[in-house]
A protein has these predicted regions:
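An alpha-beta-alpha
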Residues: 47, 51-67, 100, 104-108, ...
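Hydrophobic alpha-helical
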Residues: 1-14, 30-40, 59, 151-177, ...
């Protein structure tokens, strides 16, 4: 049960095994079409296309894989599919007039928008109302004030991401007295295990490892000096991600020399942190940035310094960062699945409104 198994190929039987097999599915049809087009090109024109083509590969996740990360109290991660809502429970939910609030650490990104859409789409199935959505702008004091407002509304449940794992803990403890709490990605420090329902999380360690490996592949065969622009705040998700990226570079890619590691704390500080780092370490050729929003400010700083030769690796996908991937300054990116995570959190909330039989950690 502790071993994950991944298959390569798209054979039909992989879905029929127990458990169903997670696979890397190649776009064989697309590759075949390209081959036929090249053949007809040669027949019709005599021109031989000398170009390498690669089949696209899609990761289809099924139940043969499990998260390596554990919850705040060492819990193994349960799969979203393990939480089942019966027809009878659906009817009870629709008749229950339940109310839910959402407290985001910050919004204004595709990541947050997709989380909210996933939550809304899932809760709508059960007739559950969303009575408020707050944006703390990564300000713990502001989130505490917003949580007090939510507490006075007395929703049946709250889906929340703490802006700061330490500074918000007392307010979340008060909120837990009147509402069921489901956390996304992070649980405030020293929250008692029985004071919240569940933490729904992506594997941030794997997220960081993915970015580190992309950096390693990019720098393969050459000595490169790198800089790490990390979050540096009391926030579990980014801390786990940043540490994992740094660790895999240090342990597995000895050709990459990490010259500087600096935290920006608040997003707007990433611009100056980058400028200072590159001014002091002009030999840096590769930068890790904790996620896309600060990465956009790092790109702005690099452009002003005429250092677009520096390759950037980051996490989370938004329209602007995708444009920079196309132009080439962003060389690698690992992203979560925010819509699915939002739906899972809402699914957990719906189940918890009727039952205490909910896993403590889902991912």
């Amino acid at each position: 049960e502790e071993i994950s198994v991944v298959g390569f190929g798209d054979e039909g039987w992989s879905e029929l095994t127990y458990p169903p097999l997670t696979i890397l599915k190649r776009d064989v049809e697309g590759l075949s079409r390209r081959a036929v087009n090249m053949l007809f090109e040669k027949i019709n024109t005599g021109h031989v296309i000398e170009q390498d083509y690669y089949a696209d590969v899609e990761l289809i996740i099924r139940k043969s894989t499990r998260m390596l990360d554990n919850g705040p109290f060492g819990e193994e991660a349960a799969t979203p599919e393990s939480i089942v809502i019966t027809k009878e429970e659906k009817s009870r939910l629709r008749a229950g007039n339940f109310r839910v609030a959402i407290s985001f650490h910050y919004t204004g990104t595709s990541w947050a928008e997709l989380h909210e859409k996933g939550i809304r789409d899932e809760l709508e199935q059960y007739g559950i109302d969303i009575i408020s959505v707050t944006d703390a702008h990564f300000d713990a004091s502001l989130q505490n004030a917003q949580l007090e407002g939510i507490r006075l509304q007395k929703p049946d449940a709250v889906i929340a991401i703490p802006a700061d794992d330490k500074e918000t803990k007392e307010q979340f403890r008060e909120l837990a007295k009147v509402s069921k709490l489901v956390f996304l990605s992070s649980v405030p420090e020293n929250m008692e295990k029985n004071s919240y329902v569940c933490c729904v999380s992506v594997n941030e360690i794997e997220n960081g490892i993915n970015v580190g490996r992309m950096m390693g592949q990019y720098c393969k065969g050459k000595h490169v000096e790198a800089g790490f622009i990390i979050h540096g705040a009391v926030f579990y998700g980014t801390r786990a991600r940043d540490e994992a990226a740094e660790k895999i570079i240090s342990e597995q890619y000895k050709n990459i020399d990490i010259k500087a590691i600096r935290g920006f704390g608040e997003i707007e500080n990433a611009y100056q942190v980058c400028k200072d780092m590159i001014t002091e370490n002009p030999q840096i050729k590769v930068l890790y940035v904790s996620w896309d929003r600060p990465a956009l400010l790092v790109i702005k700083a690099l452009k002003e310094m005429h250092r677009e030769d520096i390759a950037i690796f980051t996490t989370d996908l938004d329209y602007k960062i995708a444009q920079y991937m196309e132009s080439g300054i962003v060389k690698g990116l690992s992203t979560q699945r925010p819509y699915e995570q939002g739906r899972t959190a809402a699914h957990v909330v719906a189940k918890s409104l009727l039952s205490n039989d909910v896993p403590k950690y889902v991912g």
